[in-house]
């Protein structure tokens, strides 16, 4: 891994060795890791994310910790709704005195919890939630950052839905109709909004023939599947996730849906592994970045991390890492790299404000490639899109290696201070 601890004496910043301005505490670092550990989102999202937090903390501790301080990881369940998460975040920061709160898969959780960073004075890093509204202002241009102590260490849903639109334009330039089935809350509404705006800009001839909004946690999609089949769109966009995506896929298989209609899944990368060999081929799948266990990053450092990460995760948990795993890695290593960067200037253990300053404009290596957190406190990433394809080597479809597209970060991330929708509408 190469995560090297930095000694106190090496942090003097011009001072004599051993004369650190700020002593490094000897007690462990208390880091909260909040993911869905129960419920429909646990198996495909929360548990893989939590497993990765545990794996990374274990590796960091074996390598000496962060500036010599071992991590005491506090895994917490995101289940229970928004009010429960607000209460939990307050407790973690104000009572448990965590050094950092890393977490949150649900966009609703993030929208409620991240404002608590500045209110409580605690560092909160959102690791997986996708709504673009989390860090954007109400109109362009807007001031950044929205939160002084709040960050997101992964890109927002803009990359997924813009990436899908770019992919569809390349591979299906003659389609005429699309439809959507998305969960009826911020994540689903925002995902469809960005996809629809991008499609109108890139392929203005395409018409929307059906939009459906099942509730989060729905267990019966037969009516939705029938309605989509009746509308006969060329492609159906979906941001269904977790157990909802698995349930929809299995019910759609039983109704012959995929024999007639192609799906374009925003952040659909985990589901072939979850469903198994029955997962349909030729479906369009986005990876929430370049978070895919067979992706080989072009730079040597990231490529080495990817090989280690995939092998280590598979050895520990018997599965291949999916994108929530990569997002968890990014959160804990964003914190580690920010602390080490801040310590060089602080001359010892940095304050929360100093860590936040160091995390702003931070670039650090990851298994998917270098990650940059911009001055708006949001990470930007490239995005990978491909087609599902069965092969003899794996018991589930992989992405067809001959038809994968990586769209670079500048093509799928709006500039700092510009709302994503406004940016798309400005395309020439």
Residue map of PLM features:
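Beta-alpha junction/loop-to-helix N-cap segments that form part of ligand/metal-binding clefts
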Residues: 20-22, 44-49, 64-139, 153, ...
């Amino acid at each position: 891994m190469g995560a090297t601890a930095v000694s106190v004496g090496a942090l003097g910043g011009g001072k004599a060795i051993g004369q650190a301005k700020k002593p490094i505490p000897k007690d462990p670092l208390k880091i909260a890791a909040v993911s869905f550990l129960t419920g429909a989102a646990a198996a495909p999202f929360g548990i893989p994310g939590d497993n990765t937090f545990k794996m990374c903390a274990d590796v960091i501790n074996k390598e000496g910790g962060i500036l010599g301080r071992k991590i005491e990881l506090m895994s917490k369940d995101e289940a229970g709704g928004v009010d429960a998460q607000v209460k939990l975040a307050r407790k973690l920061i104000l009572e448990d005195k965590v050094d950092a709160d890393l977490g949150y898969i649900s966009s609703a959780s993030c929208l409620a919890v991240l404002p608590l960073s500045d209110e409580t004075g605690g560092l909160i890093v959102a690791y997986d939630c996708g709504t673009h509204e989390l860090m954007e202002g109400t109109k362009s241009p807007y001031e950044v950052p929205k939160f002084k102590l709040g960050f997101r260490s992964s890109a927002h849903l803009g990359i997924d839905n813009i990436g899908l639109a770019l992919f569809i334009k390349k591979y299906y330039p003659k389609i005429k109709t699309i439809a959507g089935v998305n969960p009826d809350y911020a994540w689903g509404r925002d995902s469809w909004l960005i996809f629809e705006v991008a499609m109108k800009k890139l392929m203005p001839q395409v018409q929307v023939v059906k939009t459906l909004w099942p509730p989060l946690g729905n267990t019966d999609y037969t009516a939705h599947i029938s309605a989509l089949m009746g509308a006969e769109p060329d492609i159906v966009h979906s941001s269904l996730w977790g157990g909802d995506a698995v349930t929809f896929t299995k019910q759609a298989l039983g109704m012959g849906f995929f024999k007639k209609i192609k799906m374009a899944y925003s952040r659909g990368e985990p589901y072939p592994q979850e469903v198994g060999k029955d997962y349909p081929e030729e479906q369009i799948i986005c990876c929430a970045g370049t978070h895919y266990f067979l992706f080989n990053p072009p730079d040597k450092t990231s490529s080495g991390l990817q090989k280690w990460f995939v092998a280590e995760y598979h050895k520990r948990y018997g599965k291949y890492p999916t994108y929530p795993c990569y997002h968890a890695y990014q959160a804990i290593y964003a914190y580690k790299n920010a602390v080490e960067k801040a310590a060089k200037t602080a001359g010892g253990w940095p304050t929360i404000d100093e860590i936040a300053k160091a995390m702003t404009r931070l670039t650090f290596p990851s298994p998917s490639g270098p990650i940059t957190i911009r001055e708006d406190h949001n990470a930007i990433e490239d995005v990978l899109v491909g087609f599902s394809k069965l092969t003899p080597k794996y018991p589930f479809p992989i992405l067809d290696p001959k038809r994968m597209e990586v769209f670079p970060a500048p093509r799928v991330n709006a500039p700092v201070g510009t709302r994503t929708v406004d940016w798309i509408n400005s395309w020439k």
